[in-house]
Amino acid sequence: MAKRIKTPADIGALVRIVRKEQNLRQDELAGVAGVGLRFIVDLEAGKPTAQIGKVLQVLQTLGCSIDILAPGERRK
């Protein structure tokens, strides 16, 4: 499922949806992703100052990937 992400809240919502689809609790995701429970709670709440490295770590753990398109590029 491709999602257009424009805000930290969009990332948080995506993380929550995918986590629930995988039947993971927040503490379980935190454990397998190697981050703290507070980080997952804040991430899902759309905290705008979440550390990008940890965000990428959580997304990778969930099996998500990020495609960044330069101006003028189109999704293939």
Swiss-Prot record:
UniProt entry tagged with the keyword DNA-binding: yes
Keywords: DNA-binding, Plasmid, Transcription, Transcription regulation
DNA-binding residue intervals: 26-45
Superkingdom of origin: Bacteria
Gene Ontology molecular function: any one: DNA binding
This protein's record includes keyword Transcription regulation: yes
Domain HTH cro/C1-type: 15-69
InterPro entries tied to this protein: Cro/C1-type_HTH (IPR001387), Lambda_DNA-bd_dom_sf (IPR010982), Tscrpt_reg_HipB-like (IPR017507)
Annotated CDD domains: HTH_XRE
Name the UniProt record assigns to this protein: Uncharacterized HTH-type transcriptional regulator y4mF
UniProt organism field: Sinorhizobium fredii (strain NBRC 101917 / NGR234)
